[in-house]
């Protein structure tokens, strides 16, 4: 019998790579050989760290996306990138698979992340079974499915900015316009940069429709999204999350927890020592992920709000966000007396620190799962893609946070920032309920990945299928 060998094909963005690597580690722990492949540029950066920390059983390979020296979002065209990654990626991915076969290690199953439907086409051509690794919530996949299957006209009405507009989709909560993925709201299409997104999601669903038994592995867990996981009858949605290092889920991470956290940045900052000096549940942590750049005006409003609440904070402002000298925050001296600003931090280490009181977040799915798994309530500031849906779930379904309201210019003002942070932090009834709910979801997340937990059982069943197909 051939040794089971999974090829994991990952879109080259930090938010895709992190959960994919955790997935790879889980497969390896269950005795599956894994080859992790992403773009040449991302592979080069990973390889430096992987040389010393990659777990045994994980192989790294690269495919070309046509931008082997890196994609520069402020210069390069996103639509051209998606065209290049398809054409170059398809050919070079075939080469990776054929080379592996020539070496006596044939790929027996292919798993790919979203935005890469062409990877499934390559697998089909080479008669290799494939599965999609969906790294957003099941709720978001359901919304896209409904959009392309009977609800498109109704959802297009959401762009009218009518505050009373809402839609009830099967097995999902009542959704307003602000709760839909941004690519479905036509007002967001004025930015032509991401016009490739919706057709790519449609192609992804068409690809699944063309399979006899489409499998979608979802970075969620049954207790968190029980109804959304059952919403699409013709797809087999399988909750296998949260895909974060097990050492942060109350378990032992036998495969080097340092590998697969934050591959593209490291910091020698003393922020952890600083957190150690702070009282329990006192820190406001502010971070907006690896892609989002805030306007100077928005940063000023956040700074003003932080100064007004007079609470210690840890704020991540990435190096590429740094302004010219004349554009730096006007109240920097006051800020530095009250809190700490860093270019990067290990988010899971921060979220699990006893001093953490709340997380002001863009609500990317990785950050959302990390906050739930750490039991930290959220002040939600969503911007685009799935973040509005995630904020809806945080505020109204899981009840672990509050969503900030933007003004007519799309800016959250300092008074609103102050109001929302105080709801979570001031010890009142609402904040207390959020804390209790956050603790509840923390325990449920840990239970899901323990032996006999829903995600562990689901992943074992998938591994059994992979092994049988050899």
Swiss-Prot record:
Induction of its expression: Induced by abscisic acid (ABA).
pH and activity: Optimum pH is 3.67-8.
Documented EC number(s): 2.4.1.121, 2.4.1.263
Binding site for an anthocyanidin: 16
Signal peptide, first to last residue: none
Cited SUPFAM superfamilies: UDP-Glycosyltransferase/glycogen phosphorylase
UniProt keyword list: Abscisic acid signaling pathway, Cytoplasm, Developmental protein, Glycosyltransferase, Nucleus, Transferase
Location in or out of the cell: Cytoplasm; Nucleus
Group of enzyme by EC: transferase
GO molecular function annotations of the record: abscisic acid glucosyltransferase activity; indole-3-acetate beta-glucosyltransferase activity; quercetin 3-O-glucosyltransferase activity; quercetin 7-O-glucosyltransferase activity
PROSITE patterns the record matches: UDPGT
Keyword set includes Transferase: yes
GO cellular component, one term: cytoplasm
Keyword Nucleus: yes
InterPro entries, sorted: UDP_glucos_trans, UDP_glycos_trans_CS
Tissues in which the UniProt entry reports expression: Expressed in flowers and fruits, especially in pulp, and, at lower levels, in seeds.
UniProt note: phenotype after gene disruption: Increased sensitivity to exogenous abscisic acid (ABA) and increased resistance to drought stress due to smaller stomatal apertures. Acceleration of fruit ripening with abnormally long shape by enhancing ABA levels and promoting the early release of ethylene (IAA) in immature fruit, and associated with altered expression of fruit ripening genes (e.g. ethylene biosynthesis and cell wall catabolism). Up-regulation of the expression of CYP707A2, which encodes an ABA 8'-hydroxylase, thus preventing excessive ABA accumulation. Seeds exhibit delayed germination and root growth.
Family statement drawn from the similarity comment of this UniProt entry: Belongs to the UDP-glycosyltransferase family.
Role noted for this protein: Glucosyltransferase acting on both abscisic acid (ABA) and auxin (IAA). Required for ABA-mediated fruit ripening, seed germination, and negative responses to drought.
Annotated protein name in UniProt: UDP-glycosyltransferase 75C1
């Amino acid at each position: 019998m051939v040794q089971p060998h999974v090829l994991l094909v990952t879109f080259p963005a930090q938010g895709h790579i992190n959960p994919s690597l955790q997935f790879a580690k889980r497969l390896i722990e269950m005795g599956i050989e894994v080859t992790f492949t992403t773009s040449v540029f991302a592979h080069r950066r990973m390889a430096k760290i992987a040389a010393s920390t990659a777990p045994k059983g994980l192989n790294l390979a690269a495919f070309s996306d046509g931008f082997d020296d890196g994609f520069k979002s402020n210069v390069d065209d996103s639509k051209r990138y998606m065209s290049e990654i398809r054409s170059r990626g398809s050919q070079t991915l075939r080469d990776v698979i054929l080379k592996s076969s020539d070496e006596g290690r044939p790929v027996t199953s292919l798993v790919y992340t979203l935005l890469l439907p062409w990877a499934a086409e390559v697998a089909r051509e080479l008669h290799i079974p494939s599965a999609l690794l969906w790294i957003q919530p099941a709720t978001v996949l359901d919304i896209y499915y409904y959009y392309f299957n009977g609800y498109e006209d109704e959802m297009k009405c959401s762009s009218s900015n009518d505050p009373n507009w809402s839609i009830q989709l099967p097995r999902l909560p009542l959704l307003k316009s602000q709760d839909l993925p941004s690519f479905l709201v036509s007002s967001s299409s004025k930015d032509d940069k991401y016009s490739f997104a919706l057709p790519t999601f449609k192609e992804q669903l068409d690809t699944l429709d063309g399979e006899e038994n489409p499998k979608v592995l979802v970075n969620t867990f049954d207790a968190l999204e029980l109804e959304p996981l059952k919403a699409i009858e013709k797809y087999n949605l399988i909750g296998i999350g949260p895909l974060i290092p097990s050492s942060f889920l109350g378990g032992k991470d036998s495969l080097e927890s340092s590998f697969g956290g934050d591959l593209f940045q490291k910091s020698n900052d003393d922020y952890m020592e600083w957190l150690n000096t702070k009282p329990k549940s006192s820190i406001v942590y502010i971070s907006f992920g690896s892609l989002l750049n805030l306007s100077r005006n928005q940063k000023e409003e956040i700074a003003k709000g932080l100064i007004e609440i007079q609470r210690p904070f840890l704020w991540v402002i990435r190096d590429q966000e740094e302004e010219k000298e004349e554009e730096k925050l006007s109240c920097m001296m006051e800020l530095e007396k009250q809190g700490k600003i860093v270019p990067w931090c290990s988010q899971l280490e921060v979220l699990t620190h006893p001093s953490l009181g709340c997380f002001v977040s863009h609500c990317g799915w990785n950050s959302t799962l990390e906050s739930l798994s750490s039991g930290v309530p959220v002040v939600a500031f969503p911007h685009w893609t799935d973040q509005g849906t995630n904020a809806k779930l945080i505020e109204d379904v899981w009840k672990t946070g509050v969503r900030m309201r933007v003004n007519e210019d799309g800016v959250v003002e300092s008074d609103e920032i102050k109001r929302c942070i105080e709801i979570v932090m001031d010890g009142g009834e609402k904040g207390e309920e959020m804390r209790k709910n956050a603790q509840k979801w923390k325990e449920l997340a840990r239970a899901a990945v323990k032996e006999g937990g829903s995600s562990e059982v689901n992943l074992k069943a998938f591994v059994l299928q992979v092994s049988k197909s050899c």
